[in-house]
């Protein structure tokens, strides 16, 4: 029997993630594997903001097509990029232990967000981040920032931006200091994207090793990520819309906090629920209903126009 084939995007971060799974497959499952690089739509179109490209699965669709054809055995994704609805026959075989979930402020000249001058230019790929930045500083000029981690940092260092916002997990995985000034936002200051900090391994449910990969699953991370994904799914949301949601466990209790709004920060809903872990999905439903009653659907429809 040949090696399993892991499908991965070609960026340094994506390959770190694929190699991480490759090493764990060998160590924990005694399975040999090799990596096949796949270019996705999101990798090919670099001069357009992600929300303007259109379609779901900008960083996953091509990998899913190869899974369905049997040309690769598994695909390793940043879980935050994985759509909440799968192609028929596909599912997550495991969700790995979460790394740091926070978003991080980086700048060459300014130590933190509040020290930026009026009208400062802040780069981010994410409407979710833009929305939450605008909530704090309506005067900021938030602009699309595309490319891999190193490309984004070069744009900062060259003076194209006064500051940029990146995921802390990616910086840690690549062991990058990033810039002279680096400060992570707390989860309360900036609610992360669903699944942020975790890796998701996608496979055909019928694959003979699908169940085997449960050995790589982290129960607590998976539980929290599934709560977050259920919330986004309940809003018919995708990866490129301004929704932040974060679930955390505190012993036998769970807290779920969420935010959604227009990218300009003008109309925003933010709420949280907490309760017994055994009623976690009921809490998600309760939170969803509270958002819907506050006009979430209407705000998300308006957000599509940005």
Curated annotation (Swiss-Prot):
Residues modified to S-(dipyrrolylmethanemethyl)cysteine: 239
Catalytic activity field: 4 porphobilinogen + H2O = hydroxymethylbilane + 4 NH4(+)
Pathway(s) it belongs to: Porphyrin-containing compound metabolism; protoporphyrin-IX biosynthesis; coproporphyrinogen-III from 5-aminolevulinate: step 2/4
Enzyme class label: transferase
Cofactor(s) required, per the database record: dipyrromethane
Gene Ontology biological process terms from the UniProt entry: protoporphyrinogen IX biosynthetic process
One Pfam family cited in the UniProt record for this chain: Porphobil_deamC
Superkingdom, taxonomy of origin: Bacteria
Keyword Signal set for record: no
EC number: 2.5.1.61
Keyword line: Porphyrin biosynthesis, Transferase
GO cellular component: cytoplasm
Cofactor binding, note field: Binds 1 dipyrromethane group covalently.
Coiled-coil annotated spans: none
Any GO MF annotation of the entry: hydroxymethylbilane synthase activity
Description of how the protein assembles with itself and partners: Monomer.
Function: Tetrapolymerization of the monopyrrole PBG into the hydroxymethylbilane pre-uroporphyrinogen in several discrete steps.
Other comments on record: The porphobilinogen subunits are added to the dipyrromethane group.
Family the entry assigns: Belongs to the HMBS family.
Record's protein name: Porphobilinogen deaminase
Organism expressing this protein natively: Helicobacter pylori (strain Shi470)
